[in-house]
UniProtKB/Swiss-Prot annotation:
EC number(s) stated in the UniProt entry for this protein: 3.5.4.2
Name this polypeptide is given: Adenine deaminase
NCBIfam families linked: ade
A molecular function GO annotation: adenine deaminase activity
Catalysed reactions listed for this entry: adenine + H2O + H(+) = hypoxanthine + NH4(+)
One of the GO BP terms on file: adenine catabolic process
Protein family: Belongs to the metallo-dependent hydrolases superfamily. Adenine deaminase family.
Origin superkingdom: Bacteria
Record-linked HAMAP family: Adenine_deamin (MF_01518)
Amino acid sequence: MNKETGMLKPWIEAQARLVEVAAGRAPADLVIRGGQWVNVHTREVIPGMDVAVADGRVAYVGPDAGPSVGPGTQVIEADGRFMVPGLIDAHMHVESGMLTPAGFAAAVIPHGTTTIFHDPHEIANVLGLEGVRLMRDESLLQPISMFTQMPSCAPSAPGLETTGQPITEGEVAQAMGWDGIVGLGEMMNFPGVASGDRQMLTEIAATRAAGKTVGGHYASPDLGRPFHAYVAGGANDDHETTTEAQGIARVRQGMGCMMRLGSAWYDVESQITAITEKGLDPRFFILCTDDSHSGTLVNDGHMNRVVRHAVDCGCDPLVAIQMATINAASHFGLERELGSITPGRRADVILTSDLRSLPIETVIAQGVVVAETGKLLVDCPRIAWPEAARDSVHLGRSLTGADFAVRATGDSARVRVIGVVENQAPTRALTAQLPIRDGVVEPQGETCHIALVERHRGTGGVVNGFVSGFGYQGRMAVASTVAHDSHHMIVVGTDRDSMAAAANHLGRIGGGVTVFRDGEELATVALPIAGLMSDRPAAEVAEAAQGIVKAMQDCGCTLNNAYMQHSLLALVVIPELRISDLGIVDVTRFELVDLMV
Protein backbone atom coordinates (compact mmCIF):
# COMPACT_ATOMS: atom_id res chain seq x y z
CA MET A 1 0.00 0.00 0.00
CA ASN A 2 1.36 3.41 -0.96
CA LYS A 3 1.24 5.37 2.29
CA GLU A 4 1.00 8.69 0.43
CA THR A 5 -1.86 7.86 -1.93
CA GLY A 6 -3.54 4.96 -0.12
CA MET A 7 -3.46 3.01 -3.39
CA LEU A 8 -2.07 -0.49 -3.85
CA LYS A 9 1.01 -0.59 -6.06
CA PRO A 10 0.95 -2.96 -9.02
CA TRP A 11 3.07 -6.04 -8.34
CA ILE A 12 5.70 -4.96 -10.86
CA GLU A 13 6.30 -1.75 -8.92
CA ALA A 14 6.53 -3.63 -5.63
CA GLN A 15 8.62 -6.55 -6.92
CA ALA A 16 12.07 -5.27 -5.96
CA ARG A 17 11.04 -4.40 -2.42
CA LEU A 18 9.23 -7.71 -1.98
CA VAL A 19 12.48 -9.48 -2.83
CA GLU A 20 14.45 -7.41 -0.31
CA VAL A 21 11.93 -8.01 2.46
CA ALA A 22 11.68 -11.73 1.71
CA ALA A 23 15.47 -12.01 1.83
CA GLY A 24 15.58 -10.23 5.18
CA ARG A 25 17.57 -7.33 3.77
CA ALA A 26 14.80 -4.74 4.22
CA PRO A 27 12.13 -4.21 6.87
CA ALA A 28 8.52 -5.16 6.25
CA ASP A 29 5.60 -2.82 6.80
CA LEU A 30 3.73 -5.51 8.73
CA VAL A 31 4.60 -8.88 10.22
CA ILE A 32 2.12 -11.43 11.57
CA ARG A 33 3.97 -13.72 13.95
CA GLY A 34 3.25 -17.23 15.17
CA GLY A 35 0.12 -18.20 13.28
CA GLN A 36 -1.29 -21.34 11.71
CA TRP A 37 -1.07 -20.81 7.96
CA VAL A 38 -4.16 -21.94 6.06
CA ASN A 39 -2.68 -22.81 2.69
CA VAL A 40 -5.47 -22.96 0.12
CA HIS A 41 -3.10 -24.17 -2.61
CA THR A 42 -2.35 -27.43 -0.79
CA ARG A 43 -5.39 -27.57 1.49
CA GLU A 44 -3.35 -27.85 4.68
CA VAL A 45 -2.76 -25.99 7.92
CA ILE A 46 0.89 -25.32 8.76
CA PRO A 47 1.61 -24.21 12.33
CA GLY A 48 4.28 -21.85 13.61
CA MET A 49 4.41 -19.55 10.58
CA ASP A 50 5.05 -15.83 10.09
CA VAL A 51 3.87 -13.53 7.31
CA ALA A 52 5.79 -10.43 6.21
CA VAL A 53 4.02 -7.74 4.20
CA ALA A 54 5.43 -4.88 2.10
CA ASP A 55 3.58 -2.39 -0.10
CA GLY A 56 0.29 -4.10 0.64
CA ARG A 57 1.49 -7.48 -0.64
CA VAL A 58 2.76 -10.67 0.93
CA ALA A 59 6.56 -10.80 0.75
CA TYR A 60 7.34 -13.84 2.88
CA VAL A 61 5.58 -16.77 4.53
CA GLY A 62 7.79 -18.95 6.67
CA PRO A 63 8.89 -19.96 10.14
CA ASP A 64 10.83 -16.80 11.01
CA ALA A 65 10.15 -13.30 9.70
CA GLY A 66 12.47 -11.84 12.34
CA PRO A 67 15.06 -10.55 9.83
CA SER A 68 12.26 -8.55 8.15
CA VAL A 69 11.27 -6.72 11.33
CA GLY A 70 12.59 -3.17 11.55
CA PRO A 71 11.97 -0.19 13.85
CA GLY A 72 8.91 0.86 11.86
CA THR A 73 7.43 -2.59 11.30
CA GLN A 74 3.98 -3.22 12.75
CA VAL A 75 3.99 -6.61 14.47
CA ILE A 76 0.81 -8.59 15.13
CA GLU A 77 1.02 -11.60 17.41
CA ALA A 78 -1.19 -14.33 16.01
CA ASP A 79 -0.73 -16.41 19.16
CA GLY A 80 -1.48 -19.64 17.34
CA ARG A 81 -4.58 -18.39 15.59
CA PHE A 82 -5.37 -19.43 12.03
CA MET A 83 -4.25 -17.11 9.24
CA VAL A 84 -6.96 -17.41 6.59
CA PRO A 85 -7.04 -15.61 3.23
CA GLY A 86 -9.52 -12.75 3.12
CA LEU A 87 -12.92 -13.95 1.93
CA ILE A 88 -14.19 -13.33 -1.61
CA ASP A 89 -17.79 -12.90 -2.77
CA ALA A 90 -17.66 -14.09 -6.36
CA HIS A 91 -21.10 -12.89 -7.41
CA MET A 92 -23.31 -10.29 -5.82
CA HIS A 93 -25.24 -7.07 -6.28
CA VAL A 94 -24.28 -4.23 -3.95
CA GLU A 95 -27.65 -2.56 -4.43
CA SER A 96 -29.44 -5.49 -2.80
CA GLY A 97 -28.06 -4.32 0.53
CA MET A 98 -29.73 -0.92 -0.06
CA LEU A 99 -26.22 0.52 0.30
CA THR A 100 -23.73 2.23 -1.98
CA PRO A 101 -20.35 0.52 -2.51
CA ALA A 102 -18.87 2.52 0.37
CA GLY A 103 -21.66 1.55 2.74
CA PHE A 104 -21.47 -2.06 1.63
CA ALA A 105 -17.72 -2.21 2.15
CA ALA A 106 -18.09 -0.74 5.63
CA ALA A 107 -20.68 -3.39 6.47
CA VAL A 108 -18.76 -6.45 5.26
CA ILE A 109 -15.15 -5.65 6.17
CA PRO A 110 -15.62 -6.57 9.86
CA HIS A 111 -16.96 -9.95 8.67
CA GLY A 112 -13.71 -10.76 6.85
CA THR A 113 -14.68 -9.95 3.27
CA THR A 114 -11.73 -8.40 1.43
CA THR A 115 -12.77 -8.90 -2.20
CA ILE A 116 -16.08 -8.44 -3.99
CA PHE A 117 -17.08 -9.09 -7.59
CA HIS A 118 -20.26 -7.12 -8.09
CA ASP A 119 -22.64 -6.69 -10.99
CA PRO A 120 -24.43 -3.31 -10.74
CA HIS A 121 -27.19 -4.23 -13.14
CA GLU A 122 -29.78 -2.80 -10.75
CA ILE A 123 -28.57 0.78 -11.15
CA ALA A 124 -27.82 0.13 -14.83
CA ASN A 125 -31.52 -0.45 -15.40
CA VAL A 126 -32.28 2.95 -13.88
CA LEU A 127 -29.35 5.16 -14.93
CA GLY A 128 -27.68 3.19 -17.70
CA LEU A 129 -23.94 3.32 -18.34
CA GLU A 130 -23.56 6.40 -16.14
CA GLY A 131 -24.91 4.42 -13.19
CA VAL A 132 -22.32 1.72 -13.80
CA ARG A 133 -19.56 4.32 -13.93
CA LEU A 134 -20.68 5.82 -10.62
CA MET A 135 -20.67 2.41 -8.93
CA ARG A 136 -17.26 1.64 -10.41
CA ASP A 137 -15.89 5.00 -9.25
CA GLU A 138 -16.96 4.50 -5.63
CA SER A 139 -15.80 0.88 -5.67
CA LEU A 140 -12.27 1.89 -6.65
CA LEU A 141 -12.01 4.15 -3.60
CA GLN A 142 -12.55 1.38 -1.06
CA PRO A 143 -9.91 -0.15 1.25
CA ILE A 144 -10.83 -3.62 -0.04
CA SER A 145 -10.84 -4.96 -3.59
CA MET A 146 -14.17 -4.26 -5.29
CA PHE A 147 -14.24 -5.41 -8.91
CA THR A 148 -17.12 -4.36 -11.13
CA GLN A 149 -18.75 -6.50 -13.80
CA MET A 150 -20.32 -4.63 -16.70
CA PRO A 151 -24.07 -5.39 -16.76
CA SER A 152 -25.05 -7.40 -19.80
CA CYS A 153 -28.82 -7.29 -19.91
CA ALA A 154 -30.73 -4.06 -19.47
CA PRO A 155 -33.48 -4.92 -20.03
CA SER A 156 -32.97 -8.48 -18.84
CA ALA A 157 -35.50 -9.78 -21.37
CA PRO A 158 -36.13 -7.50 -24.37
CA GLY A 159 -39.75 -7.53 -25.45
CA LEU A 160 -40.97 -8.63 -22.03
CA GLU A 161 -40.15 -5.47 -20.05
CA THR A 162 -39.03 -1.86 -20.51
CA THR A 163 -36.02 -0.60 -18.61
CA GLY A 164 -35.08 2.93 -17.63
CA GLN A 165 -31.87 3.00 -19.65
CA PRO A 166 -31.04 0.15 -22.04
CA ILE A 167 -27.43 -1.04 -22.26
CA THR A 168 -26.02 -1.49 -25.78
CA GLU A 169 -23.32 -3.81 -27.05
CA GLY A 170 -21.24 -0.73 -27.88
CA GLU A 171 -21.38 0.37 -24.26
CA VAL A 172 -20.34 -3.10 -23.13
CA ALA A 173 -17.32 -3.01 -25.43
CA GLN A 174 -16.46 0.49 -24.18
CA ALA A 175 -16.62 -0.53 -20.53
CA MET A 176 -14.28 -3.46 -21.09
CA GLY A 177 -11.50 -0.88 -21.38
CA TRP A 178 -12.26 0.79 -18.05
CA ASP A 179 -10.14 0.31 -14.96
CA GLY A 180 -11.91 -1.83 -12.39
CA ILE A 181 -14.10 -3.70 -14.89
CA VAL A 182 -13.33 -7.40 -14.50
CA GLY A 183 -15.81 -8.89 -16.93
CA LEU A 184 -19.43 -9.14 -18.05
CA GLY A 185 -22.24 -9.34 -15.52
CA GLU A 186 -24.64 -12.25 -15.47
CA MET A 187 -25.96 -13.01 -18.94
CA MET A 188 -29.62 -13.33 -18.01
CA ASN A 189 -31.01 -13.52 -21.52
CA PHE A 190 -30.27 -17.22 -21.77
CA PRO A 191 -32.92 -17.84 -24.45
CA GLY A 192 -31.26 -15.11 -26.53
CA VAL A 193 -27.83 -16.69 -26.23
CA ALA A 194 -29.18 -20.16 -26.99
CA SER A 195 -31.00 -18.87 -30.07
CA GLY A 196 -27.98 -16.93 -31.36
CA ASP A 197 -29.17 -13.39 -30.59
CA ARG A 198 -26.64 -11.03 -32.18
CA GLN A 199 -26.44 -8.49 -29.36
CA MET A 200 -25.96 -11.11 -26.67
CA LEU A 201 -23.25 -12.94 -28.61
CA THR A 202 -21.52 -9.65 -29.46
CA GLU A 203 -21.38 -8.65 -25.79
CA ILE A 204 -19.90 -12.00 -24.83
CA ALA A 205 -17.38 -11.86 -27.68
CA ALA A 206 -16.25 -8.35 -26.67
CA THR A 207 -15.69 -9.56 -23.12
CA ARG A 208 -13.74 -12.63 -24.15
CA ALA A 209 -11.68 -10.55 -26.61
CA ALA A 210 -10.68 -8.34 -23.68
CA GLY A 211 -9.52 -11.44 -21.80
CA LYS A 212 -12.23 -11.10 -19.18
CA THR A 213 -14.81 -13.35 -17.55
CA VAL A 214 -18.44 -13.76 -18.64
CA GLY A 215 -20.96 -14.15 -15.84
CA GLY A 216 -23.72 -16.65 -16.48
CA HIS A 217 -27.38 -17.00 -15.55
CA TYR A 218 -29.18 -20.05 -16.89
CA ALA A 219 -32.39 -20.13 -14.88
CA SER A 220 -34.00 -23.17 -16.45
CA PRO A 221 -34.20 -26.82 -15.39
CA ASP A 222 -33.79 -27.85 -19.05
CA LEU A 223 -30.34 -29.43 -19.39
CA GLY A 224 -30.89 -30.38 -23.01
CA ARG A 225 -29.87 -28.57 -26.19
CA PRO A 226 -30.74 -25.04 -24.95
CA PHE A 227 -28.37 -25.51 -22.02
CA HIS A 228 -25.57 -26.77 -24.24
CA ALA A 229 -26.12 -23.89 -26.65
CA TYR A 230 -25.92 -21.42 -23.77
CA VAL A 231 -22.62 -22.88 -22.55
CA ALA A 232 -21.23 -22.84 -26.09
CA GLY A 233 -22.15 -19.15 -26.24
CA GLY A 234 -19.39 -18.35 -23.78
CA ALA A 235 -20.77 -17.98 -20.24
CA ASN A 236 -18.13 -18.98 -17.69
CA ASP A 237 -20.24 -19.59 -14.58
CA ASP A 238 -23.75 -19.86 -13.20
CA HIS A 239 -25.26 -19.07 -9.81
CA GLU A 240 -28.86 -20.02 -10.66
CA THR A 241 -28.35 -23.69 -9.84
CA THR A 242 -30.54 -25.02 -7.05
CA THR A 243 -29.91 -28.79 -7.15
CA GLU A 244 -26.93 -31.11 -7.06
CA ALA A 245 -27.61 -32.32 -10.60
CA GLN A 246 -27.74 -28.78 -11.96
CA GLY A 247 -24.49 -27.83 -10.27
CA ILE A 248 -22.68 -30.92 -11.52
CA ALA A 249 -23.97 -30.31 -15.05
CA ARG A 250 -22.39 -26.84 -15.06
CA VAL A 251 -19.02 -28.04 -13.82
CA ARG A 252 -18.94 -30.98 -16.23
CA GLN A 253 -19.37 -28.50 -19.09
CA GLY A 254 -16.47 -26.35 -17.86
CA MET A 255 -18.42 -23.69 -16.01
CA GLY A 256 -17.93 -22.52 -12.46
CA CYS A 257 -20.83 -23.49 -10.20
CA MET A 258 -21.50 -20.59 -7.84
CA MET A 259 -23.48 -21.84 -4.86
CA ARG A 260 -25.30 -19.00 -3.16
CA LEU A 261 -26.44 -18.24 0.34
CA GLY A 262 -28.07 -14.84 0.36
CA SER A 263 -30.77 -13.33 2.51
CA ALA A 264 -33.47 -15.34 0.77
CA TRP A 265 -31.50 -17.90 -1.28
CA TYR A 266 -30.49 -21.15 0.42
CA ASP A 267 -28.93 -23.10 -2.43
CA VAL A 268 -25.70 -24.37 -0.86
CA GLU A 269 -27.09 -27.33 1.08
CA SER A 270 -28.78 -28.88 -1.94
CA GLN A 271 -25.64 -28.71 -4.10
CA ILE A 272 -22.67 -29.19 -1.80
CA THR A 273 -23.40 -32.91 -1.71
CA ALA A 274 -21.62 -33.04 -5.07
CA ILE A 275 -18.47 -32.56 -2.99
CA THR A 276 -19.37 -34.03 0.40
CA GLU A 277 -21.13 -37.18 -0.85
CA LYS A 278 -20.11 -37.70 -4.47
CA GLY A 279 -16.52 -36.66 -3.82
CA LEU A 280 -16.18 -34.45 -6.89
CA ASP A 281 -13.22 -32.12 -7.29
CA PRO A 282 -14.18 -28.85 -5.54
CA ARG A 283 -11.96 -26.56 -7.64
CA PHE A 284 -14.78 -25.29 -9.80
CA PHE A 285 -17.35 -24.90 -7.04
CA ILE A 286 -17.48 -21.37 -5.65
CA LEU A 287 -19.42 -19.73 -2.82
CA CYS A 288 -21.27 -16.44 -3.24
CA THR A 289 -24.21 -14.46 -1.83
CA ASP A 290 -25.92 -12.96 -4.91
CA ASP A 291 -28.26 -10.76 -2.84
CA SER A 292 -27.80 -9.80 0.82
CA HIS A 293 -30.14 -7.55 2.74
CA SER A 294 -28.50 -4.90 4.94
CA GLY A 295 -29.98 -6.54 8.02
CA THR A 296 -28.32 -9.83 7.12
CA LEU A 297 -24.98 -8.08 6.69
CA VAL A 298 -25.13 -6.26 10.00
CA ASN A 299 -26.61 -9.05 12.12
CA ASP A 300 -25.52 -12.33 10.54
CA GLY A 301 -22.47 -11.63 8.43
CA HIS A 302 -21.45 -11.93 4.82
CA MET A 303 -19.10 -14.53 3.31
CA ASN A 304 -18.17 -15.75 6.80
CA ARG A 305 -21.83 -16.71 7.13
CA VAL A 306 -21.68 -18.62 3.84
CA VAL A 307 -18.51 -20.49 4.81
CA ARG A 308 -19.99 -21.43 8.19
CA HIS A 309 -23.14 -22.66 6.48
CA ALA A 310 -21.14 -24.81 4.07
CA VAL A 311 -19.30 -26.35 7.03
CA ASP A 312 -22.61 -26.95 8.81
CA CYS A 313 -23.74 -28.78 5.67
CA GLY A 314 -20.87 -31.24 6.08
CA CYS A 315 -18.14 -29.57 4.06
CA ASP A 316 -14.52 -29.78 5.22
CA PRO A 317 -13.67 -26.29 6.57
CA LEU A 318 -10.57 -26.09 4.37
CA VAL A 319 -12.61 -26.90 1.26
CA ALA A 320 -15.22 -24.33 2.24
CA ILE A 321 -12.48 -21.72 2.64
CA GLN A 322 -11.03 -22.65 -0.75
CA MET A 323 -14.45 -22.11 -2.34
CA ALA A 324 -14.56 -18.61 -0.83
CA THR A 325 -10.97 -17.65 -1.69
CA ILE A 326 -8.67 -19.26 -4.25
CA ASN A 327 -11.47 -20.85 -6.29
CA ALA A 328 -13.09 -17.46 -6.80
CA ALA A 329 -9.80 -15.71 -7.57
CA SER A 330 -8.83 -18.40 -10.07
CA HIS A 331 -12.20 -18.19 -11.77
CA PHE A 332 -11.57 -14.56 -12.63
CA GLY A 333 -7.94 -15.17 -13.60
CA LEU A 334 -6.70 -13.31 -10.53
CA GLU A 335 -5.08 -16.15 -8.59
CA ARG A 336 -1.69 -14.44 -8.90
CA GLU A 337 -3.15 -11.28 -7.40
CA LEU A 338 -5.34 -12.49 -4.54
CA GLY A 339 -7.08 -15.46 -2.98
CA SER A 340 -4.20 -16.92 -0.97
CA ILE A 341 -1.59 -15.92 1.59
CA THR A 342 1.40 -16.37 -0.69
CA PRO A 343 4.17 -14.08 -1.96
CA GLY A 344 3.15 -11.35 -4.38
CA ARG A 345 -0.55 -11.58 -3.58
CA ARG A 346 -2.51 -8.80 -1.92
CA ALA A 347 -2.03 -9.12 1.81
CA ASP A 348 -5.63 -9.97 2.65
CA VAL A 349 -5.63 -11.98 5.87
CA ILE A 350 -8.13 -12.97 8.54
CA LEU A 351 -7.06 -14.06 12.01
CA THR A 352 -9.51 -16.51 13.59
CA SER A 353 -9.37 -18.92 16.49
CA ASP A 354 -11.61 -21.57 14.92
CA LEU A 355 -12.07 -22.73 11.32
CA ARG A 356 -15.53 -24.18 11.83
CA SER A 357 -17.34 -21.31 13.53
CA LEU A 358 -15.00 -18.78 11.89
CA PRO A 359 -15.09 -15.90 14.38
CA ILE A 360 -13.53 -12.91 12.61
CA GLU A 361 -11.06 -11.46 15.08
CA THR A 362 -8.69 -9.41 12.91
CA VAL A 363 -9.08 -8.39 9.27
CA ILE A 364 -6.16 -7.20 7.16
CA ALA A 365 -6.79 -5.89 3.64
CA GLN A 366 -3.92 -4.96 1.34
CA GLY A 367 -1.58 -4.93 4.30
CA VAL A 368 -3.68 -2.65 6.50
CA VAL A 369 -5.56 -3.70 9.63
CA VAL A 370 -9.08 -2.70 8.63
CA ALA A 371 -11.16 -4.33 11.39
CA GLU A 372 -10.68 -5.76 14.85
CA THR A 373 -13.24 -7.86 16.77
CA GLY A 374 -16.11 -6.57 14.67
CA LYS A 375 -15.09 -2.91 14.67
CA LEU A 376 -14.28 -1.10 11.42
CA LEU A 377 -10.97 0.76 11.72
CA VAL A 378 -10.76 2.54 8.35
CA ASP A 379 -12.75 5.02 6.30
CA CYS A 380 -14.75 3.91 3.27
CA PRO A 381 -14.74 6.97 0.98
CA ARG A 382 -17.87 8.05 -0.87
CA ILE A 383 -18.37 9.88 -4.14
CA ALA A 384 -20.72 12.84 -4.51
CA TRP A 385 -23.78 11.24 -6.11
CA PRO A 386 -25.21 13.62 -8.75
CA GLU A 387 -28.71 15.04 -8.69
CA ALA A 388 -29.74 12.84 -11.62
CA ALA A 389 -29.13 9.79 -9.43
CA ARG A 390 -31.36 11.26 -6.71
CA ASP A 391 -34.30 12.09 -8.99
CA SER A 392 -35.32 8.77 -10.50
CA VAL A 393 -38.95 8.16 -9.48
CA HIS A 394 -41.37 9.58 -12.04
CA LEU A 395 -44.95 8.35 -11.65
CA GLY A 396 -46.50 11.01 -13.86
CA ARG A 397 -49.65 11.32 -11.76
CA SER A 398 -51.20 10.64 -8.37
CA LEU A 399 -52.57 7.11 -8.16
CA THR A 400 -55.93 6.06 -6.72
CA GLY A 401 -57.36 2.77 -5.55
CA ALA A 402 -59.17 2.42 -8.87
CA ASP A 403 -55.81 2.07 -10.64
CA PHE A 404 -55.33 -1.29 -8.93
CA ALA A 405 -58.69 -2.82 -9.85
CA VAL A 406 -58.88 -5.78 -12.24
CA ARG A 407 -62.20 -5.41 -14.05
CA ALA A 408 -64.21 -8.33 -15.37
CA THR A 409 -67.77 -9.50 -15.94
CA GLY A 410 -69.67 -12.38 -14.40
CA ASP A 411 -69.65 -13.84 -10.89
CA SER A 412 -66.07 -15.14 -10.81
CA ALA A 413 -62.92 -15.37 -12.90
CA ARG A 414 -60.04 -17.82 -13.16
CA VAL A 415 -56.81 -15.84 -13.06
CA ARG A 416 -53.10 -16.53 -13.16
CA VAL A 417 -51.38 -16.17 -9.79
CA ILE A 418 -47.68 -15.75 -9.05
CA GLY A 419 -46.90 -18.32 -6.35
CA VAL A 420 -44.01 -17.30 -4.09
CA VAL A 421 -41.76 -20.15 -2.90
CA GLU A 422 -40.02 -19.55 0.42
CA ASN A 423 -36.20 -19.32 0.23
CA GLN A 424 -36.23 -19.85 -3.54
CA ALA A 425 -35.89 -17.44 -6.44
CA PRO A 426 -38.25 -19.31 -8.80
CA THR A 427 -42.00 -18.81 -8.43
CA ARG A 428 -44.84 -21.15 -9.35
CA ALA A 429 -47.37 -20.46 -12.06
CA LEU A 430 -50.69 -20.97 -10.25
CA THR A 431 -54.32 -20.25 -11.02
CA ALA A 432 -57.20 -19.31 -8.75
CA GLN A 433 -60.95 -18.87 -9.12
CA LEU A 434 -61.68 -15.46 -7.60
CA PRO A 435 -65.03 -13.72 -7.00
CA ILE A 436 -66.16 -10.68 -8.97
CA ARG A 437 -67.95 -7.94 -7.05
CA ASP A 438 -69.26 -4.80 -8.75
CA GLY A 439 -67.26 -5.66 -11.85
CA VAL A 440 -63.93 -6.03 -10.00
CA VAL A 441 -62.01 -9.27 -9.38
CA GLU A 442 -61.43 -9.52 -5.62
CA PRO A 443 -58.57 -11.46 -4.00
CA GLN A 444 -59.39 -13.98 -1.32
CA GLY A 445 -57.57 -16.38 0.98
CA GLU A 446 -53.82 -16.45 0.29
CA THR A 447 -54.19 -14.42 -2.90
CA CYS A 448 -53.33 -10.70 -2.94
CA HIS A 449 -53.21 -7.92 -5.47
CA ILE A 450 -49.91 -7.23 -7.20
CA ALA A 451 -49.24 -4.26 -9.45
CA LEU A 452 -46.30 -2.89 -11.37
CA VAL A 453 -46.24 0.91 -11.60
CA GLU A 454 -44.06 2.44 -14.33
CA ARG A 455 -41.59 4.87 -12.72
CA HIS A 456 -38.87 5.70 -15.25
CA ARG A 457 -40.69 7.80 -17.85
CA GLY A 458 -43.73 9.07 -15.98
CA THR A 459 -46.24 7.29 -18.20
CA GLY A 460 -48.64 6.64 -15.32
CA GLY A 461 -48.92 3.04 -16.44
CA VAL A 462 -50.11 0.33 -14.04
CA VAL A 463 -50.16 -3.42 -14.75
CA ASN A 464 -52.23 -5.53 -12.36
CA GLY A 465 -52.13 -9.17 -11.34
CA PHE A 466 -52.36 -11.53 -8.38
CA VAL A 467 -49.82 -13.16 -6.07
CA SER A 468 -49.95 -15.71 -3.25
CA GLY A 469 -47.65 -17.00 -0.55
CA PHE A 470 -47.05 -13.94 1.63
CA GLY A 471 -49.87 -14.58 4.11
CA TYR A 472 -50.94 -10.93 4.32
CA GLN A 473 -54.12 -10.09 6.26
CA GLY A 474 -56.19 -6.99 6.87
CA ARG A 475 -56.17 -3.82 4.74
CA MET A 476 -52.51 -3.37 3.84
CA ALA A 477 -49.96 -2.77 1.10
CA VAL A 478 -46.22 -2.94 0.49
CA ALA A 479 -44.63 -0.77 -2.21
CA SER A 480 -41.03 -0.80 -3.41
CA THR A 481 -38.93 0.85 -6.10
CA VAL A 482 -36.55 -2.10 -5.75
CA ALA A 483 -38.11 -4.42 -8.31
CA HIS A 484 -35.56 -6.55 -10.13
CA ASP A 485 -34.47 -6.08 -12.77
CA SER A 486 -36.02 -3.06 -14.48
CA HIS A 487 -36.82 -1.51 -11.11
CA HIS A 488 -40.17 0.06 -11.73
CA MET A 489 -42.38 0.08 -8.64
CA ILE A 490 -43.90 -3.12 -7.27
CA VAL A 491 -46.99 -2.86 -5.06
CA VAL A 492 -48.48 -5.88 -3.25
CA GLY A 493 -51.54 -5.58 -1.09
CA THR A 494 -54.94 -6.70 0.07
CA ASP A 495 -56.47 -3.22 -0.13
CA ARG A 496 -56.40 -1.01 -3.22
CA ASP A 497 -56.58 2.31 -1.37
CA SER A 498 -53.61 1.33 0.79
CA MET A 499 -51.75 0.34 -2.39
CA ALA A 500 -52.33 3.80 -3.85
CA ALA A 501 -51.26 5.51 -0.63
CA ALA A 502 -48.04 3.47 -0.46
CA ALA A 503 -47.16 4.09 -4.11
CA ASN A 504 -47.78 7.83 -3.89
CA HIS A 505 -45.66 8.03 -0.73
CA LEU A 506 -42.66 6.54 -2.53
CA GLY A 507 -43.21 8.94 -5.39
CA ARG A 508 -42.98 11.86 -2.99
CA ILE A 509 -39.80 10.71 -1.18
CA GLY A 510 -37.89 9.59 -4.28
CA GLY A 511 -37.97 5.85 -3.80
CA GLY A 512 -37.58 3.14 -1.20
CA VAL A 513 -39.75 0.52 0.46
CA THR A 514 -42.84 1.24 2.52
CA VAL A 515 -45.61 -0.66 4.32
CA PHE A 516 -49.10 0.81 4.78
CA ARG A 517 -52.03 -0.54 6.77
CA ASP A 518 -55.52 0.93 6.71
CA GLY A 519 -54.13 3.73 4.54
CA GLU A 520 -51.51 4.75 7.13
CA GLU A 521 -47.72 4.38 6.98
CA LEU A 522 -46.29 1.65 9.22
CA ALA A 523 -42.64 1.71 8.12
CA THR A 524 -40.45 3.18 5.40
CA VAL A 525 -36.84 2.89 4.34
CA ALA A 526 -35.91 5.77 2.04
CA LEU A 527 -33.64 4.89 -0.90
CA PRO A 528 -32.95 8.21 -2.61
CA ILE A 529 -30.11 7.03 -4.88
CA ALA A 530 -31.75 5.61 -8.01
CA GLY A 531 -34.62 4.43 -5.81
CA LEU A 532 -32.30 1.55 -4.85
CA MET A 533 -29.73 2.70 -2.31
CA SER A 534 -29.17 4.88 0.71
CA ASP A 535 -25.97 6.72 1.55
CA ARG A 536 -26.66 6.33 5.28
CA PRO A 537 -24.53 3.93 7.39
CA ALA A 538 -25.31 0.23 7.09
CA ALA A 539 -26.55 -0.12 10.68
CA GLU A 540 -29.00 2.74 10.19
CA VAL A 541 -30.29 1.32 6.92
CA ALA A 542 -30.53 -2.14 8.47
CA GLU A 543 -32.59 -0.78 11.36
CA ALA A 544 -35.01 0.90 8.96
CA ALA A 545 -35.12 -2.24 6.82
CA GLN A 546 -35.85 -4.34 9.90
CA GLY A 547 -38.78 -2.02 10.48
CA ILE A 548 -40.05 -3.04 7.05
CA VAL A 549 -39.71 -6.73 7.91
CA LYS A 550 -41.53 -6.25 11.22
CA ALA A 551 -44.30 -4.28 9.54
CA MET A 552 -44.72 -7.07 6.97
CA GLN A 553 -44.95 -9.58 9.80
CA ASP A 554 -47.46 -7.41 11.64
CA CYS A 555 -49.55 -7.58 8.47
CA GLY A 556 -49.52 -11.38 8.62
CA CYS A 557 -46.50 -12.25 6.49
CA THR A 558 -44.94 -15.58 7.44
CA LEU A 559 -42.11 -15.80 4.88
CA ASN A 560 -38.43 -15.74 5.76
CA ASN A 561 -37.04 -12.41 4.52
CA ALA A 562 -40.18 -11.54 2.61
CA TYR A 563 -38.70 -8.27 1.40
CA MET A 564 -36.23 -10.09 -0.86
CA GLN A 565 -39.04 -12.22 -2.27
CA HIS A 566 -41.07 -9.07 -2.85
CA SER A 567 -38.25 -7.44 -4.78
CA LEU A 568 -38.03 -10.33 -7.29
CA LEU A 569 -41.65 -10.53 -8.35
CA ALA A 570 -40.87 -8.67 -11.59
CA LEU A 571 -37.69 -10.62 -12.41
CA VAL A 572 -38.73 -11.89 -15.82
CA VAL A 573 -35.72 -14.15 -16.36
CA ILE A 574 -36.42 -16.60 -13.52
CA PRO A 575 -39.34 -19.04 -13.88
CA GLU A 576 -42.16 -19.52 -13.68
CA LEU A 577 -44.53 -16.52 -13.60
CA ARG A 578 -43.72 -12.80 -13.22
CA ILE A 579 -45.15 -9.33 -13.78
CA SER A 580 -43.64 -6.52 -15.87
CA ASP A 581 -44.65 -3.13 -17.21
CA LEU A 582 -45.84 -4.96 -20.34
CA GLY A 583 -48.02 -7.54 -18.59
CA ILE A 584 -47.90 -11.01 -17.04
CA VAL A 585 -44.87 -13.03 -18.15
CA ASP A 586 -44.67 -16.81 -18.49
CA VAL A 587 -40.92 -17.24 -18.06
CA THR A 588 -40.93 -20.93 -18.95
CA ARG A 589 -42.04 -19.91 -22.44
CA PHE A 590 -40.60 -16.37 -22.39
CA GLU A 591 -43.84 -14.79 -23.54
CA LEU A 592 -46.56 -12.45 -22.32
CA VAL A 593 -49.79 -14.16 -21.28
CA ASP A 594 -53.27 -13.00 -20.34
CA LEU A 595 -54.06 -12.53 -16.67
CA MET A 596 -57.37 -14.30 -17.21
CA VAL A 597 -57.15 -18.01 -17.94
